[in-house]
Amino acid sequence: PAYEILSGLVGSEMCIRDSIYNVLPGTTSAASVKAKFLKRLILKDDSVVEIDQKLAFDLLSHMKGGPSVEVLLDLAFHEDTKIAEQAANVLKTQVFLYEADTNRLEEKYNAGNKIAEDILESYSEAEFFTKLNAIPEKIKVVTYVAAEGDISTDLLSPGNQAHSRSDRELHGQCFISKKAQDEISQLKIAHPDKSVMLVAEKGTMGVGSSRMSGVNNVALWTGKKASPYIPYVNVAPIVAGTNGISPIFLTTVGVTGGIGIDLKNWVKKKDSDGNIILNNDGEPILEQLYTVETGTELTINTKTKKLYNKEETKELVDVSSSFTRQKVEFMKAGGSYSIVFGKKLQNFAANILNKDPAPVFASPREIHSEDQGLTAVEKIFNKNAVGLTSDKKLVAGSDVRVKVNIVGSQDTTGLMTSQELEAMAATVISPSLDGAYQSGCHTASVWDIKAQDNIPRLMQFMHDFGLITARDPKGIYHSMTDVIHKVLNDLTIDDWAIIIGGDSHTRMSKGIAFGADSGTVALALATGEATMPIPESVKVTFKGDLHSHVDFRDVVHSTQAQMLKQFGENVFQGRVIEVHIGTLMSDQAFTFTDWTAEMKAKASVCISNDDILIESLKISKKRIQTMIEKGMDNKNQTLKGLVDKASLRIEEIKSGERPALKPDRNAKYFAEVVVDLNEINEPMIADPDVSNVDISKRYTHDTIRPISYYRAEKTVDLGFVGSCMVHKGDMKIVAQMLRNLEKKSGEVKFKAPLVVAAPTYNIIDELKEEGDWEILEKYAGFQFDDKNPKQAARTEYENILYLERPGCNLCM
């Protein structure tokens, strides 16, 4: 019936556009119908006046993979040699081939088929890449300052509009503001020969998360169309910041073949002796080197790797880091995925033809140091490295393709991840992964009509793909809305593991975890691998004793304050924080590692001793077993496999065969921060400093103050204990405080609203076993109901205790 409908489109240009052009590529059901229909047109089994054979092949060439590649292979091996040759020429441009496709090529080649041989020869030479146009030598840009200070990804793609992220046209309407959208549109009209460069003046671009939807929105408003036949998918955005681009956001920019520029247009003013000059508030005085105010015309030279003024008479800043050979490859190919899949395809073809692949792509940068020990992250990367050319150990700065152990997909970005998987033509999870999890935490707080429509579809897709899902597509087991990072922390059963998660707070107390955009998550799910440079590390150790009246949260804040005091700038940005937490259990260590996302660190890794690691692994085993008992395991018995691997790791540690991860004594660090616990003598407050006269210093995460600074003059508007930044111990403290108040006064009265949201159901179960949940329930004026969850966000609060559903209530 679909073919009959499509065949009736003769003479209707609008119908042709909407039914043929505007179809999402990859493995979508519409793409399957489209590919088969185009095959019928090529074979003249059907006809549409507006689509001749040449256009039909052109349309197939833009469909990326899956059913389109299947059709192209059918046509390449067709008896009509003219059709076969045309299909082969299109196939030579495609990179999203999977095992079923490559198996067909190999079989035909082994049977002596010349077309198959011709295609494989082309792949071995990487003609799908070499025949693409080079990036322009000169890129003319006009600036648009989106804001002064750090720009959160929430400005580019608001969290409260997460339901529409997979609908690029609709979600694009929430980009910054209507005023900004109009101003950008006017700049494009006034400068048709230039690209609009989005700027964070006096700040860092893209802090807070990787936010693929944020990059999509920037590309939608300022980038270029990826294909004339694919709606609302743009590539090549250009973003910039005085202090550069946040590391995880920069990775996402690379996914779309974009450019991220560190402007360095403001510097700290120095005196004649080279000392930084401070103002009356003790803050460095900034000096402007050149302007990037909205409407400024600049030129990027991709050959000299410099940023120039409009006339190209003055060099403004070196941008070599923006145009490494690998990044230029991403730009040329329209994104990093094409390079990842292209390399695999080239290696496959070369192997079949028994030849070396053509040296087309940038060789991975391999940095060795014979007399240097390894940091913890360097050890993890070396253990998990794939395809190394030598046995020499790699150090920071080396480009490495690594095996990924655990992958997490988040529910507000999951629909985008599923779209990316469809676009890559992926249909099943990589068997090399230890496990993968689809969360339901960000839609736990408000189960509105949008979530009710979107999330069941997402859970079904991910379940079919091979993930453990928070919600049961069959509706049998109890929905688990636990915070994604907490679940991944439990699922991580090896301190040498690499974890990729679809959320900026993907930080673990075991192994090393990287927050990633939905596309990188999709790539990890499909291939079981990730590619990135080994990051530099900053070592954090502690001295002194922690006073009994302060909390570990105060240690977290003080680490930030003492680091800034020691170095004058954020040495954590873009690096791994290697924290030596010693005897902290995994839940407490998680509190520290989760915070590192706020300091713009790329990741964090915890160094603990053997006994503590064993206890942490036992906690993981218990919690995974609980998931199994709830009926959450899949047909592959992923969860059972994790329990078995945890048991094996415990035995390795006990026997001394493979002790807990530790860096070498002579490891090289970018910096070493020593936190003096004796200095922490009162609670520490992280202040967004919203009234700072310097706008760029607001919302920076850099203002840490002792509670005495506020002289007890502040009123508390609302208290919140929960979500990913707390652990069970924090919940027990709240319970004990209620007991203490009850004992003292006979009752507990609330003078402000208090919201308590356990991160996971496991923690609630444990609090019930340990007698702490009872007191929380006793004084709760509201308690979540799984059978009747909230369907709208709460905007007004009474002075009562709210016991909210486990999940990401704070953010959402």
Which residues fall in each region the model found?
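Fe-S-dependent hydro-lyases/dehydratases of central metabolism
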Residues: 22-34, 41, 58-77, 81-812
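Residue-level detector of extended alpha-helical repeat arrays and alpha-solenoid scaffolds
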Residues: 13, 17, 49-53, 84
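Short, small-residue-biased leader/transition segments that mark boundaries at the very start
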Residues: 1-16
